[in-house]
Amino acid sequence: MLREFVTTTCAGNDYSTWSRPNRRLLGQEIYLPSGISEKVEDLVVAVDTSYSVGNRELNVAKTEIKSICDTVEPDMVRLLYWGSRVVGDETYTVDTMNSFVTSTRPKCGGGTEVECVTDYMQEKAIKPQAAIVITDGYVSGWSKWDCPVLWVIIDNKGAKPNVGKYVHVRSEDMR
């Protein structure tokens, strides 16, 4: 589900444009549109590190995030660790993504107020193409998002965000 969300929400778009004809054929006086490819620029992954999310879930999340990044190759991934406030902010680029799984250091953050993530993003002018929020869903509210958001809710079938898409995951199914 994570990979599908990222690839459909922010995967690069390929399209053709007549504003720049294909130069390879101009010498033969053949005018065809040139192909333009847009790629994924920025992706935010916000990880709930309140005390109800354990190491097993964090390790599986790290591996899945790395796999997604290998698939869509974003220019930058902004990893935010949060509880009642954002307690960790790590940035990974195409060049540093290979070290992501071993170099990231989750920081614990107490309560679970997801609004701290959107406030932080606004304060730091972080404007991703999409956000993925990994949480147990025991939050005080779902906040308002300025980008598409996917909620990965662990062990809480009752949590139903009123914004974005969501998927429920059982921690015992995470391997």
Locations of regions flagged by a protein language model:
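Acidic, polar low-complexity linker/tail segments
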Residues: 1-44, 53-56
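Composition- and surface-driven signal marking solvent-exposed, interaction-prone regions
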Residues: 2, 58-60, 144-147
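Intrinsically disordered, low-complexity regions enriched in small/polar residues
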Residues: 7, 17-20, 33, 83, ...
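Von Willebrand factor
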Residues: 9-10, 38-94, 116-135, 139, ...
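Intrinsically disordered, low-complexity regions
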Residues: 13, 28, 55, 89, ...
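Von Willebrand factor type A / integrin I
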Residues: 85-87, 98-175
